[in-house]
């Protein structure tokens, strides 16, 4: 860069800093690259599919799928994992359907969980924004976008037409809270429902509620589906679940994970650990027997999973081995610190 351009740039940067504050514009090379902090989903396979070990903090996440596919269960699992790390969590229950007893069975500390059951969509989103701006909340779940009913619709008659009202509400709210979410380093999860578009001849007729704004503002979008039933004899005790990462701004998208959700218990993590351990060579399988580090741990997947449940130390070791192999390592801070410094531009005294 020639001297005249350097002086012009320095003058512009100086004026910007005086007008908007220090840090309004900065060189990316002046700061070490930070790994994006993540909160585990409670599913090891899904954490790996997300690329960073969980859902990213400081971002918006959308989880959508058909009814009874496990959307709320997955978000409660995220809350349980966050609370284990000492995080403060909130649940904005726009559907008025949160079951504290079920949440407790999934590992959620319901005594410490903040819950709001707002009357209108405006109230729900305003409460969410105020919680974010407090800088004291780590995870907020909004259940669901479809239940964020605009005030005008509630006060109107049952047959009144309110075209695009909810979409405008979501668009305005997301414009307002996105920057606050980043500054507060808070994870905000929106649960959404599926609707069918009429008259679609080609492609999928499925769409989500609340317009297109959430699709743009979300850093991660998860499509969760129930693919089958988990049975013990003739009794159905859970569901086979597939989650596809349809959008990901923090890692490569379109990966997917499959796991089981057991009724009244949540995500079947130990069974998932057995499957991933066998797949990646950490657990040996011979016939119906499973072995770890040369020692047999059980006959059949169910017995092996029970062994893991009784031995949390082995679970922690196996999980670390799988994560170390499959997850991208964090940026090398030492290497970043040792790189050549970026040429600094001297600030000029003149104003533009």
Curated annotation (Swiss-Prot):
ATP binds at residues 65-72. Keywords: ATP-binding, Cytoplasm, DNA damage, DNA recombination, DNA repair, DNA-binding, Nucleotide-binding, SOS response. Residues 333-352 are annotated as: Disordered. SUPFAM superfamilies: P-loop containing nucleoside triphosphate hydrolases (SSF52540), RecA protein, C-terminal domain (SSF54752). One of its GO terms (cellular component) is cytosol. PANTHER family: MITOCHONDRIAL DNA REPAIR PROTEIN RECA HOMOLOG-RELATED, RECA. NCBIfam families: tigrfam_recA. Can catalyze the hydrolysis of ATP in the presence of single-stranded DNA, the ATP-dependent uptake of single-stranded DNA by duplex DNA, and the ATP-dependent hybridization of homologous single-stranded DNAs. It interacts with LexA causing its activation and leading to its autocatalytic cleavage. Belongs to the RecA family. This is Protein RecA. It comes from Pseudomonas fluorescens. The gene is recA.
């Amino acid at each position: 860069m020639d001297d005249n351009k350097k002086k012009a740039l320095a003058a512009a940067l100086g004026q910007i800093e005086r007008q908007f504050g220090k840090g309004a514009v900065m060189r990316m090379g002046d700061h070490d690259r930070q790994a994006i902090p993540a909160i585990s989903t409670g599913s090891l396979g899904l954490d790996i599919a997300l690329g960073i070990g969980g859902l990213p903090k400081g971002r918006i996440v959308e989880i959508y799928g058909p009814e009874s596919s496990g959307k709320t269960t997955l978000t409660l699992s995220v809350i349980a994992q966050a609370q284990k790390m000492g995080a403060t969590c909130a649940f904005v229950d726009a559907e008025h359907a949160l079951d504290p007893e079920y949440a407790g069975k999934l590992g959620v500390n319901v005594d410490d969980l903040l819950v709001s059951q707002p009357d209108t969509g405006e109230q729900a989103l305003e409460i969410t924004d105020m919680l974010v701006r407090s800088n004291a909340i780590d995870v907020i779940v909004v259940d669901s976008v479809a239940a964020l009913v605009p005030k005008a619709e509630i006060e109107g008659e049952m047959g009144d037409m309110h075209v695009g009202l909810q979409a405008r509400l979501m668009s305005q709210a997301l414009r307002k809270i996105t920057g606050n979410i980043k500054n507060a380093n808070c994870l905000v999860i929106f649960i959404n429902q599926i609707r069918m578009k009429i008259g679609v001849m080609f492609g999928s007729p499925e769409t989500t509620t609340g317009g297109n704004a959430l699709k743009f503002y979300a850093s991660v979008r998860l499509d969760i589906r129930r693919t089958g039933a988990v049975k013990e004899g003739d009794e159905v005790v859970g569901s086979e679940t597939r989650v596809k990462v349809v959008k990901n701004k923090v890692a490569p998208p379109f990966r997917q994970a499959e796991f089981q959700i057991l009724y009244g218990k949540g995500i079947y993590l130990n069974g998932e650990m057995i499957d991933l351990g066998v797949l990646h060579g950490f657990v040996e399988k011979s016939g119906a027997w499973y072995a770890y580090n040369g020692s047999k741990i059980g006959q059949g997947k169910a017995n092996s999973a029970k062994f893991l449940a009784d031995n949390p130390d082995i679970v922690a070791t196996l999980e670390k081995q799988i994560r170390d192999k499959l997850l991208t390592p964090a940026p090398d801070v030492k290497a970043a610190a040792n790189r050549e410094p970026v040429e600094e531009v001297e600030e000029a005294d003149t104003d533009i």
